[in-house]
């Protein structure tokens, strides 16, 4: 298994609902955790906060969310199966987002600051999650993946919303929006 990146068309497909949590599903979740941490090990300035199954080319409605997004040493993730946004609330705030499947590009993406999500845990327990701020943003980003939506889709026409990371780990605005973003077939694929 590996993390797939743009322009892979599977990132644009809608994922199917998980009908039964079995060894196959648990194996997918284990692979997601491993791939997230492997990616993080190769990116010293970044933290792998979450991942969706489509990012490995598996079109199942499964996401994993890091239990502590402030502590890179804490490598535990919670799996959410069939997560569904019940409602968003609060103000819409712009903040930085990146994605394992969109290499080297970051964006200032508008998202609701509060979200309520229902899902199942790996053991089949149904949960409802009220999330705010960074966790709300992360949940919305990952659930977008399950619907074939990438963070770049929310800001596609906003020239000043795109960033790259320099070799010191700082985010800097992209220099040539047309070339690096708008007309970049590697980013958007065939349309």
What is each model feature region?
Residues 1-191:
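Positively charged
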């Amino acid at each position: 298994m590996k993390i797939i990146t743009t322009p892979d068309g599977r990132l644009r497909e809608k994922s199917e609902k998980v009908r039964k949590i079995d060894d196959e599903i648990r194996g997918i979740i284990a692979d997601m955790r491993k791939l997230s941490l492997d990616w993080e090990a190769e990116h010293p300035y970044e933290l792998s906060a979450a991942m969706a199954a489509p990012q490995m080319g598996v079109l199942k409605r499964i996401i994993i969310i890091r239990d502590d997004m402030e502590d890179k040493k804490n490598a535990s993730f919670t799996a959410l199966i069939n997560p569904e946004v019940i409602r968003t609330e609060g103000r819409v705030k712009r903040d930085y987002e990146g994605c394992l499947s969109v290499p080297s590009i970051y964006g200032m993406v508008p998202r609701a600051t509060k979200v309520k999500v229902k899902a199942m845990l790996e053991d089949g327990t149904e949960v409802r999650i009220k999330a705010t701020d960074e966790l709300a943003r992360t949940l919305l980003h990952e659930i977008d993946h399950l619907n074939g939506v990438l963070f770049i889709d929310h800001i596609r026409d906003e020239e000043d919303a795109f960033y790259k990371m320099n070799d010191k780990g700082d985010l800097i605005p992209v220099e040539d929006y047309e070339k690096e973003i708008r007309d970049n077939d590697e980013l958007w694929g065939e349309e």
